[in-house]
């Protein structure tokens, strides 16, 4: 599975987008690439793909870097340390892409499209109504050079799309899926350069992988259908394509796609609750090898030795939190000395922002230190153990409580900047929309978030816990209240 055609040897990359909380799926793909590089004596690099200017933020980029460092992953090159093929942030590489786009236009491999968003949406609606998968219909494909020049001179908004063969299929070999054949008539005329001049993922990742001498592209299976577009771009430019490997997605125990709405998915969630990073990497690494029962406890070095990229399963990797808890417990008991354990606890506590902030909030609410555990322990618990009876003391009827919880959950997802002010504003908006007093809305939230009707201030608590933990607790609270409703 190695590509000996490159003089520099094996080079792989992880290329996350800084558009949200760092996902365990990112750690999963990053670990595979990291182990692959170590297995072949190659280099592992990190690149930030921030072509989505509306959702990418420096704050999320920092969180991504911090999360991957917490996982114990080290990269040879990246936006934080530089390297010979930088910049390693796509927004900083914007001027590099335009000449390649012009080359495709000059060679007749791409064309300018002037279709408006409204026209494209109408096109997709028509296609969906006819039972066809939405894709560009080629309206601008055959515009003459004179027409293009005139429309650009008139100030019309334009994007650049790639041309796709009209017939035949794209046949390639994937490192996991083997031989794959995808008909060209199912492939969209992908936008390569957006109206703002930024490249799309498809354009940028091909150019960057080539310029950074990436030999193997290992990513999630959701990108398998996009390989024809990428192979075509390599052909258009006359470049050697890398080896593609598409890893099965992580799934919940019921085989559904791992989703933040079902289970916590952010790396920060597991870090804040005291999971050991070595245990999380151990857990994820087991997806890439066959291990006998009783031999599951592996260090990063041992994972590297046993890593077997030639025998990967196409079945979804099951993210079993119970197994992670079991493995994390074994790491704490069997791998850490007493001194290491004490050091880990102290480091975790001192670096735990929610705990430190919780102590500050608690200081004005207790008369003796012994009251602190009852008041603030909810900040550290992974599971509050909520029962239907915990909500029975609230004055509102169970049906109303359930309505509040089910309404609040999706509304909180709309918050871009998660802080005390935005949380309060959103909950006040929910109360207004439901026609209820704010205290009626927050009463069940106190119990859902802290496990008690007496706790630290709600908005502060929610801000401290973070979006992932709050999401999980509201989901479990809704399940408990639903049981209360069903028992009536």
Swiss-Prot record:
GO BP, sorted A to Z: glutamyl-tRNA aminoacylation
Class of enzymatic activity (EC top level): ligase
Sequence motif: 'HIGH' region, positions: 16-26
Molecular function as annotated in GO: ATP binding; glutamate-tRNA ligase activity; tRNA binding; zinc ion binding
Pfam family, one: Anticodon_2
Entry keywords, A to Z: Aminoacyl-tRNA synthetase, ATP-binding, Cytoplasm, Ligase, Nucleotide-binding, Protein biosynthesis
Superkingdom of origin: Bacteria
EC identifiers of the protein: 6.1.1.17
Residues reported in the UniProt entry to bind ATP: 260
Catalytic activities: tRNA(Glu) + L-glutamate + ATP = L-glutamyl-tRNA(Glu) + AMP + diphosphate
Localisation per UniProt entry: Cytoplasm
Motif 'KMSKS' region boundaries: 257-261
Claim: Phosphoprotein is one of the keywords in the record: no
Coiled coil: none
Entry-linked Gene3D superfamilies: 1.10.10.350, HUPs (3.40.50.620)
InterPro entries (alphabetical): aa-tRNA-synth_I_cd-bd (IPR045462), aa-tRNA-synth_I_codon-bd_sub2 (IPR020751), aa-tRNA-synth_I_CS (IPR001412), aa_tRNA-synth_I_cd-bd_sf (IPR008925), Glu-tRNA-ligase_bac/mito (IPR004527), Glu/Gln-tRNA-synth (IPR000924), Glu/Gln-tRNA-synth_Ib_cat-dom (IPR020058), GluQ/Sye (IPR049940)
GO CC annotations, alphabetized: cytosol
Family in the record: Belongs to the class-I aminoacyl-tRNA synthetase family. Glutamate--tRNA ligase type 1 subfamily.
Functional note: Catalyzes the attachment of glutamate to tRNA(Glu) in a two-step reaction: glutamate is first activated by ATP to form Glu-AMP and then transferred to the acceptor end of tRNA(Glu).
Record note on quaternary structure: Monomer.
Protein name as it appears in the record: Glutamate--tRNA ligase
Record gene name: gltX
